[in-house]
């Protein structure tokens, strides 16, 4: 490859190693100093971890697989580790991986049976839609064929708490290669999510008892004011109560007062403040936090979406994915209305230049600044308008004083049918997670008991 303008201080190009016709190709992120010196990928400390510990876990030998990197030279890193959220690092990754001699060209030519990207950068180079937190250790069908995303082997060296998670993924890879990996499949593809009716809660005691687990979740607006409560006591179902529906909330409270089973929340520390502002009183001795349970197990993600996907096969939408499509047009409309307002011209000011001379300075009007903001956004429509607003150096207070409060991201902007599905699915997922986490906890306790008996 030619010397890259994005990385003028690069050293040696480190090509992949291993048989070119290998059925399995591993992709790392970028060479380190040891790799640059020996011109072989994964020969340093991380390489030893990979070759001596992880590859044997899945029954593979280093000389039997193809191993390369998304970025094929030691990049300049004045800011430290490469970060996909930085524009320059992302540009470097996209440019290097797409080079004629880069890793993507090699994959296009070889078309291996299985591709294993290791780390966020490698996953992004292969497919920006891969969500490593959700999908690590799970085979995916992509345009490249079957992909098995993994955390980078160095992850366990930098973050010891990740080591067990990484180890488990390599064991899963071995099972997959042998055809023995069992994947979670959502057993409830057809769900019943809707608003709760007062009659439903009135009839509840006649057809149910109060000893079953009850899962709850809350949603609030951007001011942290309560928006709704969702709950589920039967897998595949969920009900939503709006915060302003005091009649249904009072009936729900009557049901809570008699509840004898566990009441499940995922992150009770957050939800407790919301339910308190809704006027609901939950019996604290019944509360079980599934996020805390996942944390205590040690090798699991704590996010509800990641847990539900990995353990239950449930696909769930992130908050931003639900809210952004409806909040963005409102925010852009707000800015366009603000531009059309007749803003006063600011007074001229005298400022001292770098040479110490006093000069007359004419500040831009707020209208001009807003036009520049919108022009910049129109040139980069994929830009996050909310982040751009938060990062805007000018004072927001003047605009909000004239035009009203900035809409921002809020669940209030989402159509109610979408909100019902999103909120009820959270409660449903929490309910379904409970028996799985219970089983995993019992398994850990049994192993500990056997260990101490030995």
Feature locations, PLM:
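A polyanion-binding, active-site-adjacent surface
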Residues: 1-181
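A short acidic-Thr-Gly-centered motif at the start of a beta-strand
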Residues: 14-19, 195-212, 253-258
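Short, flexible loop/turn motifs enriched in small residues
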Residues: 18-21, 222-227
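Short, glycine/acidic-enriched loop or turn micro-motifs at the edges of active sites
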Residues: 31-32, 72, 155, 218-222, ...
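Two-metal-ion RNase H-like nuclease active-site motif
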Residues: 209-221
